[in-house]
Curated annotation (Swiss-Prot):
InterPro entries in the record: Kinase-pyrophosphorylase, PPDK_reg
Molecular function terms, GO-annotated: ADP binding; ATP binding; phosphotransferase activity, phosphate group as acceptor; protein serine/threonine kinase activity
Function of the molecule: Bifunctional serine/threonine kinase and phosphorylase involved in the regulation of the pyruvate, phosphate dikinase (PPDK) by catalyzing its phosphorylation/dephosphorylation.
Stored PANTHER family: PYRUVATE, PHOSPHATE DIKINASE REGULATORY PROTEIN 1, CHLOROPLASTIC
Binding site for ADP: G153, I154, S155, R156, T157, S158, K159, T160
Family: Belongs to the pyruvate, phosphate/water dikinase regulatory protein family. PDRP subfamily.
NCBIfam families, alphabetized: PRK05339.1
Pfam family, one: Kinase-PPPase
Top EC group: transferase
Keyword ATP-binding attached: no
Protein name: Putative pyruvate, phosphate dikinase regulatory protein
Amino acid sequence: MTKEKKSFHLHMLSDATGETLISVGRAVASQYTTYQATEHIYPMIRNKIQLEKALDEIKQEPGIVLYTMIDEELKLLLQKICKKIKIPCIDILHPVLNAFQSYLGTPTHLRVSAQHDLNADYFRRIEALDFTIEHDDGQSSSNLFEADVILVGISRTSKTPTSIYLANRGIKTANVPLIPNIDLPESLLEAKNSLIIGLIASAERISHIRQNRDLGEGFAFDNYTNRINIAEELIYAKRICERFGWPVIDVTRRSIEETAAAIFELLSRFREEK
């Protein structure tokens, strides 16, 4: 019998979008498997009125408070109220900034313009996500040259989820299927400023994934899931990548995050060499 999780309130305040804060909060909360966090998120806290509204809710539902704010007056007010109602209040950037300051021997100068950098990063990721969705599975191939990364591979090699993951990190990503006897789009071969990477996996893994996919009536399902056919598709994909000098990543035993990490490393080298 599964025990019901205990709940607690997790308040996260930021003078920006709060995405870094949320990621940290959720990562830590997930370590406590017998507890369930009730999240209260307060982004774009820029003035005392906005902070006081958040504080009203914190007083009603006390819990752990995490924050990232530059304004010293707002930080002091938040810390004062949390101390008064006896709840933890943690500035998640403070120890990191202190470590940088200590190691570099240079005091930290927090700047308001850093907020604009955060906003620019947020919109860059939104733009990348829009591009990636538009260029999923070979769609909108006419402007592939705008992509930072183009993933190629046969069906069920994690091209789409990997593309979405990269887009959420601000990388414009397109993915193009490699299908035997189907010509590659000219726009793919002309994308000289994009890093093109082949994704492959074992025939066993691909067959297993394909068997769990409903493709509707009239589809040649046996051919699609047959390991011998899949092995031939993989040989074709490898030959294409070898022909054009595209690096290949085997995703058989990699998580999406691990695949993305390998892509980031390749992208860094690619940009250095340009």
